[in-house]
């Protein structure tokens, strides 16, 4: 009887682990929020309620200070199933963390009126995001910035002061490259389609 109870108990635990895995695999690619439980060798362990997530040291924003008990947001980039359970990997440095923050703060992006075309980040320093509006009457850059900068400022605060350049997407590649590399002054953009190479010539001051 004792052996049967142990088998049932193990199966219940296994079923619970599988259910938790299924719950979190659906959240992969989303922003999760939790309380910092502890710090281990520079990694941050986050209590997500029914499970723990880990933000590895190299997935943190450089120079940000996180403490036990703080509430933290992070992007769930991988849920890995293992024999002892599952691991939930989180990131605050991932480019998609920035993209998903814009999804949360800008209704036009959430609704699909504005599309995020590209994202690049130097975490903690500068980020660039290219946006395109499906509706010609809506300025994608203005919508992302918000009234008096309210929308983008919320994201900047979450990223501890990371400067965010919002760029209007264009099919004209030289123009897009020039806008993306601002504030550097571009003299010329040379595109070699055959060799898939782009040469950028800056003005002498740069």
Give the residues covered by each predicted segment.
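RNA-contacting regions in translation and RNA-metabolism proteins
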Residues: 1-206
């Amino acid at each position: 009887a004792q052996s049967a109870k142990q088998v049932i108990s193990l199966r219940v635990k296994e079923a619970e682990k599988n259910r938790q895995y299924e719950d979190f695999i659906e959240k992969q690619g989303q922003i999760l929020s939790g309380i910092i439980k502890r710090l281990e060798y520079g990694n941050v362990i986050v209590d997500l309620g029914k499970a723990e997530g880990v933000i590895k040291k190299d997935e943190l924003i450089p120079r940000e200070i996180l403490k036990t008990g703080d509430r933290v947001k992070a992007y769930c980039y991988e849920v890995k199933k293992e024999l002892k359970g599952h691991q939930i990997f989180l990131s605050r440095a991932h480019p998609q963390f920035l993209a998903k923050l814009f999804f949360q703060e800008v209704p036009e992006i959430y609704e699909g009126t504005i599309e995020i075309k590209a994202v690049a980040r130097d975490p903690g320093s500068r980020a660039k995001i290219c946006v395109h509006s499906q509706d010609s009457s809506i300025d994608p850059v203005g919508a992302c910035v918000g009234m008096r900068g309210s929308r983008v400022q919320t994201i900047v605060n979450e990223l501890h002061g990371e400067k965010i350049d919002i760029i209007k997407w264009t099919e004209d590649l030289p123009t897009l490259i020039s806008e993306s590399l601002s504030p550097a002054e571009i003299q010329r953009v040379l595109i070699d389609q055959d060799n898939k190479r782009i040469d950028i010539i800056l003005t002498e001051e740069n």
